[in-house]
């Protein structure tokens, strides 16, 4: 039980987390992944090496400590965590491992003089409160997905019905249930989890669903990353007829249905969730402005599909920005990068729009800044990270 004294102690550690939280979480991951191999498949080693995962956890721990008296203020963060956990099939038995390693990291990084028995006790109680909250919320989602039409719990086998090269870097996989059963619906913008065995090692990854729900199959579109263990395995070793283990669709970066003009802005492989949103939005009459930035035509996936949609749907306007176009690239609307002048030109005159954007972090930082400058309300601009969440400001 988290007492008033526990809360006071946790809040008193906020300055320490602000200055040293990342060192603490880096030590935490190093310890946990070395000593508990059972949890390694749940974490992307590239995100560990880049520091993105420890940084994201440090921010989450800090936010929790700051709002320990008003957990309702964590609503958005809690929802993101629950969705990520469900897509990876995080289970109650994983939480004691995390808790033990977190408390150990607090003691070892802060030292016994600061991380006294009282501090460890307070953080132990605080962690248990958070774990109980997440376990309960996640169980609700697991039950909801298991009992829904076409739903399941844990993994379900899917067959690769088609494998299609979309660009020099991106390949799509069309996945149908191996049991021939019904398919769980999903919301445009959500992702799905894959459980893979690569070189004898289990790994789990999340990939955006890149086509609107059709009741027959899911589509993921995977960019080959130079050192990506999962993406290279999918590109090189998974062919039509292969079977993959999928976890249920998840994610809270989803299309909100209303009559406002819709603006979809993507960079690189960030196009994948916006495609599902685009296809769903075209079932309505709302105006759509689709803006995509990429390096050049060779890595521009789905161009023919979007051009064909624009030819059939007058409500859709699309704009392409090539950073370094090749001499034989098809026509594009601008060279370089998306900037304020181009957004002013390409967006509707009204700033009462709904904007969804996704891409590399530096791309999203620039887009967020430009949208704010030209007057798009911040509450109507939504974004998501591939991988651990971070701050754009």
From Swiss-Prot:
InterPro entries: Cbr1-like_FAD-bd_dom (IPR008333), FAD-bd_FR_type (IPR017927), FNR_nucleotide-bd (IPR039261), Globin (IPR000971), Globin-like_sf (IPR009050), Globin/Proto (IPR012292), Hmp (IPR023950), OxRdtase_FAD/NAD-bd (IPR001433). Residues 150-393 are annotated as: Reductase. It is an enzyme of class 1 (oxidoreductase). Binds 1 heme b (iron(II)-protoporphyrin IX) group per subunit. Binds 1 FAD per subunit. Its cofactor is heme b; FAD. Pfam families: FAD_binding_6, Globin, NAD_binding_1. Residues 1-139 form the Globin domain. The record marks 84, 384 as: Influences the redox potential of the prosthetic heme and FAD groups. The active site is at residues 95, 138. The record marks 29 as: Involved in heme-bound ligand stabilization and O-O bond activation. Its EC number is 1.14.12.17. Keywords: Detoxification, FAD, Flavoprotein, Heme, Iron, Metal-binding, NAD, NADP, Oxidoreductase, Oxygen transport, Transport. GO terms for biological process: cellular response to nitrosative stress; nitric oxide catabolic process; response to toxic substance. One of its GO terms (molecular function) is FAD binding. NADP(+) binds at residues 268-273. Heme b binds at residue 85. FAD binds at residues 191, 205-208, 385-388. It catalyses: 2 nitric oxide + NADPH + 2 O2 = 2 nitrate + NADP(+) + H(+); 2 nitric oxide + NADH + 2 O2 = 2 nitrate + NAD(+) + H(+). It comes from the Bacteria. NCBIfam families: PRK13289.1. Is involved in NO detoxification in an aerobic process, termed nitric oxide dioxygenase (NOD) reaction that utilizes O(2) and NAD(P)H to convert NO to nitrate, which protects the bacterium from various noxious nitrogen compounds. Therefore, plays a central role in the inducible response to nitrosative stress. Belongs to the globin family. Two-domain flavohemoproteins subfamily. Consists of two distinct domains; an N-terminal heme-containing oxygen-binding domain and a C-terminal reductase domain with binding sites for FAD and NAD(P)H. This is Flavohemoprotein. It comes from Burkholderia sp. (strain TH2).
């Amino acid at each position: 039980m988290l007492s008033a004294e526990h809360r006071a102690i946790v809040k008193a550690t906020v300055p320490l987390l602000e200055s040293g939280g990342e060192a603490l979480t880096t030590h935490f991951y190093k310890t946990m992944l070395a000593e508990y191999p059972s949890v390694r498949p749940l974490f992307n080693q590239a995100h560990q090496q880049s520091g993105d995962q420890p940084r994201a956890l440090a921010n989450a721990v800090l936010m929790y400590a700051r709002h320990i008296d008003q957990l309702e203020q964590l609503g958005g963060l809690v929802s993101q965590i629950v969705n990520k956990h469900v897509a990876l099939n995080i289970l109650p038995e994983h939480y004691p491992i995390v808790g033990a390693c977190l408390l150990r990291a607090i003691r070892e990084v802060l030292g016994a003089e600061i991380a006294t028995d009282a501090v460890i006790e307070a953080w132990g109680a605080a962690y248990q409160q958070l774990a109980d909250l997440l376990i309960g919320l996640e169980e609700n989602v697991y039950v909801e997905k298991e009992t829904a039409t076409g739903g399941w719990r844990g993994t379900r086998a899917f067959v690769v019905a088609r494998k299609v090269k979309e660009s020099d870097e991106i390949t799509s996989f069309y996945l149908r249930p191996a049991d021939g059963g019904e398919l769980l619906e999903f919301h445009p913008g959500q992702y799905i989890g894959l459980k893979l065995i690569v070189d004898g090692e289990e790994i789990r990854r999340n990939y955006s669903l890149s086509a609107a729900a059709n009741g027959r199959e899911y589509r993921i579109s995977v960019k080959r990353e130079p050192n990506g263990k999962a993406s290279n395995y999918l590109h090189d070793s998974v062919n039509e007829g292969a079977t993959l283990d999928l976890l249920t669709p998840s994610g809270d970066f989803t299309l909100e249905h209303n009559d406002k003009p819709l603006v979809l802005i993507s960079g690189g492989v960030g196009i994948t969730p916006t495609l599902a949103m685009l296809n769903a939005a075209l079932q309505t009459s709302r105006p759509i402005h689709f803006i995509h930035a990429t390096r050049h035509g060779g890595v521009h996936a789905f161009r023919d599909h979007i051009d064909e949609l624009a030819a059939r749907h007058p409500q859709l306007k699309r704009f392409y920005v090539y950073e370094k176009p090749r001499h034989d690239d098809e026509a594009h609307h601008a060279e370089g990068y998306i900037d304020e002048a181009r957004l002013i030109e390409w967006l509707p005159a009204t700033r009462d729009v709904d904007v969804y954007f996704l891409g590399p972090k530096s791309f999203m930082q620039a887009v967020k800044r430009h949208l704010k400058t030209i007057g798009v309300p911040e509450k109507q601009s939504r974004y998501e990270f591939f991988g651990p969440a971070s701050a754009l400001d």
